[in-house]
């Protein structure tokens, strides 16, 4: 039996969109685990893994954001994929050669399919092995439920979970796959990040744990970590410079549409590219 897990945020999206979809497709008796009022997606998923592990009838979990609507049952795809014991995790979209939590920047390696708020992201509907998945929806089997946890205190907030979980699964010797999970609809009507400081904290931690860093790079990583609290001040200074320069009306075609944020995140990604080919798993 495959259950469902959702970290529920403020607002009514879960009750209006996500829960009705789960109820429409889930098998009778299949449990739904919810975590509310959470400060970290990582601790929430650890807790749901613990709850699922305590139920010996559960063979897997479908974990999804609270703004995702299921129109068909992804468990049907997951059951087929998890017949292969070498697989520990399945996503809807993902990629490889990943050096950043922004896995989608590796455009040539993107695989899978999901319908987002404004477009269909279609990189192929077959089954593909990847290094990273998007956590908008992901599936794990019993082995992963029992054996994988995010180390306490290592990661925070809500950014980068899919990439980091995929790395943990691969580091434990299991494969990560993506496949079209049958008409998944992501109703996110906005763009951007839930927390830029958490994003960079998690990215730097992930680099320290899973990439071959030189002593100088490791020192630089720690020093940059100390500057993360100043990110809001950096953004404010850039916004002021744009206003003074008469460019406050500008928009970008990046992840957020905000040129100030997109330039900052783009700079982080360019730093990450020097790590290509140096992942340890």
UniProtKB/Swiss-Prot annotation:
Domain of life according to the entry: Bacteria
Biological source species: Streptomyces griseus
Disulfide bond residue pairs: none
Designated name of the protein: Streptomycin biosynthesis protein StrF
UniProt entry keywords in alphabetical sequence: Antibiotic biosynthesis, Streptomycin biosynthesis
SUPFAM superfamilies the record matches: Nucleotide-diphospho-sugar transferases
Pathway: Antibiotic biosynthesis; streptomycin biosynthesis
Pfam family, one: Glyco_tranf_2_5
Function of the molecule: May be involved in the formation of N-methyl-L-glucosamine.
GO biological process: streptomycin biosynthetic process
Keyword Transmembrane included in the entry's annotation: no
InterPro entries: Nucleotide-diphossugar_trans (IPR029044)
